[in-house]
Swiss-Prot record:
Name of the protein this chain belongs to: Ribosomal RNA small subunit methyltransferase A
The keyword Membrane appears for this protein: no
Catalytic activity as recorded in UniProt: adenosine(1518)/adenosine(1519) in 16S rRNA + 4 S-adenosyl-L-methionine = N(6)-dimethyladenosine(1518)/N(6)-dimethyladenosine(1519) in 16S rRNA + 4 S-adenosyl-L-homocysteine + 4 H(+)
GO MF, one example: 16S rRNA (adenine(1518)-N(6)/adenine(1519)-N(6))-dimethyltransferase activity
Lineage start: Bacteria, Bacillati, Cyanobacteriota, Cyanophyceae, Synechococcales
EC assignment: 2.1.1.182
Primary localisation category: cytoplasm
Compartment(s) of residence: Cytoplasm
Length: 274
């Protein structure tokens, strides 16, 4: 059984990447080594799977939700050394490889409707990061999400997601991916991004993580308002003013102007006074 009778399903968010140059950029960004074990999310018809296996990796484990694609993938790759396949929802399926080991790296053409939950599963949250972290994740996502992940303070795309992800991983853009690179073409622009999760020694300490998360939720709920308004109530006004000065910002600023490290500094100051 092949893929000739299978059409992309909207409910699964299926848009198959066919552009050779983008596929190659993903492989290059993953910086693959012969000892790597790679988790592939959403192999589809196997265009990227084929290139991963050609790299001579230790193992490639793919997770595919669509039952109708699974048999075609097995037929195509079952004889390939190191290949394994799990049919299921990546938000619920075990992420360990067939030998029980954890993958070194992740590559994924993410269905855009599960980007947030999948990022949390693969990278974690500030107060509960994935540990041990993957060495590297190369992800194809909606351009709008990519811009929010890698945005710098002061940029219109800078958000609570920007702060969270940048406190969990180093993030950079690999390449833009226009709709014509897919079949069928999506209605939005896409982008390949690379995430390199931070080691435990560089992550926010657990006692600060919950405080940072609380501050982000409160401040970015009204991102256009000044911090003197959005942070009102987290501390007595004069103390809050002193904490802001110590952390290096003004309460006249807006939340999208503060760097991730500044949020950590504010959380640390608040924790000292509790």
């Amino acid at each position: 059984m092949g893929f000739s009778g299978h059409h992309a399903r909207k409910r699964f968010g299926q848009h198959w990447l066919l552009d050779e140059s983008v596929l190659q950029r993903i492989i290059e960004a993953a910086d693959l080594q012969s000892t790597d074990r790679v988790l592939e999310v959403g192999p589809g018809r196997g265009a990227l799977t084929e290139r991963l296996l050609a790299a001579g990796l230790k193992a490639v484990h793919a997770i595919e939700l669509d039952r109708d694609l699974v048999q075609g993938l097995r037929d195509r790759f079952v004889v390939q050394p190191g290949f394994s396949l799990h049919q299921g929802d990546v938000l619920e399926a075990p992420l360990e490889l067939s030998d029980g080991r954890i993958a070194d790296k992740v590559v994924a053409n993410i269905p855009y409707n599960i980007t947030g939950p999948l990022l949390e599963r693969l990278v974690g949250r500030l107060d509960r990061p994935v540990d041990p972290p993957y060495q590297r994740l190369v992800l194809l996502v909606q351009k709008e999400v990519a811009e929010r992940i890698r945005a710098r303070p002061g940029h219109s795309s800078f958000s609570a997601l920007s702060v969270r992800m940048q406190l969990l991983a180093r993030c950079h853009s690999v390449c833009p991916v226009p709709p014509r690179c897919f079949q069928p073409p999506p209605k939005v622009q896409s982008e390949v991004i690379c995430l390199e999760p931070l080691p435990a020694s560089e992550r926010v300490m657990p006692d600060l993580a919950a405080r940072v998360e609380s501050l982000l939720k409160q401040a970015f709920l009204a991102r256009r308002k000044m911090l003197r308004n959005t942070l009102a109530g987290v501390a007595e006004p004069n103390r809050l003013k002193d904490l802001a000065a110590s952390a290096g910002f003004s309460l006249q600023q807006r939340p999208q102007e503060l760097a991730p490290a500044t949020w950590v500094a504010l959380a640390r100051g608040l924790n000292r006074g509790d």
